[in-house]
Structure formats: structure tokens, C-alpha cells
């Protein structure tokens, strides 16, 4: 073994020691109904000092030790964002120690193996000098580790050929806990790499992310969704290549997901479809995705978590389709009219902001909903007196009414006529009067 390799080996053991110590003291809680111990999974991944040192330890074994140590750091670090029983026992100081250790190892590796590292990154189409020093080891490992993680996730997936209870059969083959751990490791690997480098790794990353989305476990699906959210924010559409339609189909298939990951599937789907279809507002994918979401919302209109998540993330899709939104008014506005009078202020504020967006995009032309919308806004303005967000709600209502006045003119004035003398709406009249003056001046 060369001197640089020997030095790196010593550093690896040195970095591993405090993590091993913290891990041994941590109280690992094994989730009920599973025989997977994460501590037992982690301990063999951490190298230990041999006494005496093995004379046969070579560069290949060192590389394997680095890979395993990275797996351990990935799992420990990714636990910081998890509330799952399998990972929630990991203390924050242990995760932080793993973060710091991997950073130190990455920098040392980049110096000791700069030539090898340069070659490996070049094979992936990356410019060595443009990749941050602390990311080079991670990227070099990805062609090796991502297929391993993909296979681990797939081990407990549903076998479509089985006639028995599919989930039970899949779990009987391999405990799902191993796949959950692999999904968290995978998401950690993906989210460490940003634009412009992630696009070069699409062919490595996307198959594993799709495998996670295809799993029956919501926890694993969720990690796949978080990975695709990061991908959509850090790659160009062209870099997704022929995977585009496959990913979009997977998004649509997952819109039926449960409440615990609904917010993730909405954010992922909106980001992916707007990233890939932004130049085609009449794309069938926009239409399919919006209709799938609306179908689920129509079945559960009172589900606060679902409507809030959808209202919070949907605007980029609205912007992407523009005037084509007119074709969806018959499904969107009945939901909006119901949500405008929801008990929670968050829903009310979000739906008002989306109504404002839709009016700006479509000028609400050729629609039967103008009169109903004005009536609902007038009612909401009065209801707001009993809400905590009184001022914010009323300001949004006034802004929307002004927009309606500007785009519908005489039609709006005719509809507003029945509300003009309502003393509870008197404070709105001056704002609408200013709009009328502006229209005349124009």
C-alpha cells in the first residue's frame, strides 16, 4: 500500500472511532413488528483498528472500506429529516459527527487520489475542476453504490406475478426495513449533488428513484419523491432524456398516494411536469396530471391537509398551462367556492391567492362563474370579520374584485350592483370607484 493510501486508511479509522463510540451508547429502538436493527446494520460498515495491522490490506480493500463508511454516514446523516421509528432513535450529535467525518474524508481523498478521482469524474462527463472538492468522492462512488441501493429497495417490492397477499409476500422475502434504510441513503446521495452536476448523473439516479416510487411502502415512496423534487430543481428537461414520459407516468400513478405523502407527490408532480412540458401548455401530461389531482380533491374536499398541500404547490402548473386553464374551470371553481369558506385561515388565504393567479392568467373570459365568484367574495369579505387573518383576507378579496372589475367591466358592475348598498361592504366601494375612474381615463 502506498504512503498516501496508508495515511488515508489511518484517517478513516480515526474518523470512524467517535462515530462507533456514539453508536454503541445510543439506545436503538427496534420498531414493533420488524426484526431489522439499524444499529446492527451500521456497525459492520464502520472500520476498526486492527492490531496488528493486516499486511495484506490493499487499495481495493481500502476502497471497499471507504464505500461502506460512506453508506454509514449517508444513513446517519439522512436520519436528521426522519420521524420514522427505524431512524428516529439516532441522536443529532451522531448525525452531525457523520456529516463532519464524511466532509473530512472527502477532502483527504480528493488530495490523495486526485488522478483516479479526475478519471472517474471524466468518465461521467464531469469537469473535475468545476466539482467542489467535498463532492468528488461522492460522485465517484455513485456508479457503484446506486445500483446496490436500487437492488436493496427492489428486494421487498411487490412481485406482480404472485397471487397471494402481495405486501405480505414481499415483506416475507426481505424485511422492508432494509429497503427503507436504502431509500434514505439513496435520497441523501442524490441531494448532495446540485446543478449543474446532477444532470450528468441522470442515467444513474433516475432508475433508482423510479424503483423507490414503485415500492408499496409510503416511507420509501416518500424518499423517491424527495429525490425527484431535488432532481427537478437541479437539472434541465433535456438532461432527463427519454426518461421524461416514464417519470411523468410514475407521478400520475402516485397521485393516489395516502395523506402522509400527498404533499410530496403534488410538489414532485408539479415540478416535473412544469420542468418537462413548459413549452407546451396543451401537453396531455398537464391535462392528465391536473385531472388526476382534481379527482382526488373532489372525493375528499374537506381534507385540510390535501387541499392545503395542493393549493400551496399548484401555482407553477397553473402558470404552465395559462389560458388552457379555462377548460378546467368547471372542476376548479366548485372546489374554490367551497374552500373560500373553510374554517382555517390558511386554506382561505391560499385559495384567494390562486383565484388571483387564475384571473391574471385567463382574464376569466368566456365563463359562467363571474357572478358566483363576486357573490362568494362579498360573502367572504363579511365572514372575515370573525377570522384572525381579517386584514389579509379582506385585502386579497379587494384585489380580486379590482381585477374582476378591470377584466369584466360592465358585466362586473351589473353583478356588483346587488352588493353596492350593503353597509357591510361599504369599505370596498372606494377601491372599486378608483378602478372605474382608471378605466374611464384609459
Q: Predicted segment positions?
A:
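Helix-rich alpha-solenoid scaffolding regions
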Residues: 61-99, 105, 213, 217-279
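HEAT-repeat alpha-solenoid elements in large eukaryotic scaffold proteins
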Residues: 32-53, 99-102, 107-126, 172-190, ...
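Short coil/turn segments at helix-helix junctions and helix-capping linkers
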Residues: 3-6, 25-33, 85-93, 133, ...
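N-terminal alpha-helical scaffolding segments that mark the starts
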Residues: 1-57
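Extended helix-rich, non-globular scaffold segments
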Residues: 149, 154-158, 178, 251, ...
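Flexible loop/turn segments at the boundaries of HEAT repeats in alpha-solenoid HEAT proteins
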Residues: 50-59, 63, 109-117, 134, ...
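Core helices of alpha-solenoid repeat scaffolds
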Residues: 4-20, 58-70, 134-149, 161-164, ...
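Extended alpha-helical scaffold segments
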Residues: 59-193, 204, 216
